[in-house]
Amino acid sequence: MVGLQPSEVPPTTVVKFLGAGTAACFADLLTFPLDTAKVRLQIQGENPGAQSVQYRGVLGTILTMVRTEGPRSPYSGLVAGLHRQMSFASIRIGLYDSVKQFYTPKGADHSSVAIRILAGCTTGAMAVTCAQPTDVVKVRFQAMIRLGTGGERKYRGTMDAYRTIAREEGVRGLWKGTWPNITRNAIVNCAEMVTYDIIKEKLLESHLFTDNFPCHFVSAFGAGFCATVVASPVDVVKTRYMNAPLGRYRSPLHCMLKMVAQEGPTAFYKGFVPSFLRLGAWNVMMFVTYEQLKRALMKVQVLRESPF
């Protein structure tokens, strides 16, 4: 590394792993209410006979939650969300380049689209397998409607939720919805990582941007839109299935068929606007932060290794 400027030193796998988890947590802190609104809109209409609060639009959903459940309600499940990102994003984003390099044939100048898709599917599936319990708990908290300040709470806290689910539903309950989630996140990861990778590469090759904030912003925004379009149907099924009580759905396929029968095919795009607002904003914040963190961490590493 002698003679190289910090910005020229390729980031190590450890730097990418830690940087991705940290950047994802920062993005979650800023966009979590949008994710909660998405979950509420996705499960609305699931039980037609139930008397429940009706949500209209993203802002309307958040305002209704604040009015009926208190100002902290849009951040319900945040702790589990941060648990999720530290394990989930670190793997699916932080290991993407390493897995892509592993799949790329030796001597190849660059990775093909097929290789990038394969890498995205691989890290997405790996991440879900490790982080699924955190996602189940996050969704349960986000979907839990607690009217008034004295409303009943099923879980006393995040750790209690892990224990309660394992006790009442078995350890398998913490991995409920793993298959639809693997499908969803393989799709999301491909759309996000591959789209970001390709857009950024083309912008740099065409000299429209240098490798800086505008380039990262445009690439991340495009990645967020593509991810929302292709992943929304699976995301709705995943949310419904993970949040459902025992016995409501026999399988993710049964959940999907019941949705179509009761609500029509448009149900697959319930919560699309908050999904896009959240994924678009999340991607911009995460990728921009991630790129800067990689540079900062490598600068620290180079300065520590440099004798002068």
UniProtKB/Swiss-Prot annotation:
> What is the membrane topology here?
Multi-pass membrane protein
Q: What UniProt keywords are attached to this protein's entry?
A: Membrane, Mitochondrion, Mitochondrion inner membrane, Repeat, Transmembrane, Transmembrane helix, Transport
Gene ablation phenotype (knockout): Homozygous knockout mice lacking Ucp3 show no overt phenotype being born at the expected frequency, with no observed signs of abnormality, illness, or increased mortality at up to one year of age. They are not obese and have reduced free fatty acids and glucose serum levels. They show a normal circadian rhythm in body temperature and motor activity and have normal body temperature responses to fasting, stress, thyroid hormone, and cold exposure. The baseline metabolic rate and respiratory exchange ratio are the same in knockout and control mice.
Q: Name one Pfam family in it.
A: Mito_carr
Outcome after substituting residue 278 to L: No effect on proton transmembrane transport. No effect on inhibition by ATP, ADP and AMP
Which GO biological process entries does UniProt record here? Answer: cellular response to hormone stimulus; fatty acid metabolic process; lipid hydroperoxide transport; proton transmembrane transport; response to activity; response to fenofibrate; response to glucocorticoid; response to hypoxia
Tell me which domain of life the UniProt entry assigns to the organism this sequence originates from.
Eukaryota
**Stretches of the chain found on the membrane's Mitochondrial intermembrane side:** 1-10, 97-116, 197-213, 291-308
Activity-regulation annotation: Inhibited by purine nucleotides and inorganic phosphate (in vitro).
Q: Where are the Solcar repeats?
A: 11-102, 111-202, 211-296
Task: Give TM segment ranges.
Answer: 11-32, 74-96, 117-133, 180-196, 214-233, 268-290
Q: What name does UniProt use for this protein?
A: Putative mitochondrial transporter UCP3
Organism listed in the record: Mus musculus
